[in-house]
């Protein structure tokens, strides 16, 4: 496979089948050096399978991909030496101290002694763990384990860093701190590919690949995806049960997508004025007092829901 000279990662028609089931279906994209590139989609969309192929842990059924200039199918060893990888399980040894985990990974990466001191000091400082270097890893809060795992994955200064749903189960404040670290790595030139199902995290990516049922259904900057949203979103608030309001709008022709958004409803309409009248009329007839029904900018969640509907529904699992 000939790689574009400006691409750190490139996939062309990348496909993976398990028997008759197609987990990843002809996915193509290219990622630039220093870019934070996100995979967004529900469980079962193909995000993890794509990352496993790109890290040469799983051979493609067809198609091709290169990472840091190396073919994932024919140069797996070189690919693995060029990357860092962090999964949602973190892969830390809980019975080791923080510094011992870092030194262990430094040994796995075959770093020379002088580099071990330099890079472990960097990881401790970057993760905010200087004062916990002698702490048993298993006693750390989840957010600190997460930052330690990122430090281990980036210890050898890989050209490309793969993060597979790394913030699952972590509170929003810890997630924001984690993304600050990702930004620092990207600013230093590391290419970062990250999968997530958190919409707010997806906003931090430079570009997003939206995946559903193994297919790439959209690829662009988060702002561009929102700006290209088809139609208008109404933010609807009712006095009664929002779930009842969702059910009441199911057969309203003017309301093509209806979903809960906190205590509000987000309703997609093609014509804002006519759509608003149709929504308010139906809710009023159903005895649900309408507090407000106003147009708002589309969120990434709105974009994703609309695209999935066009593709015939979400992946299962």
Model-derived regions, located:
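Conserved ABC transporter NBD signature motif
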Residues: 63-71, 79
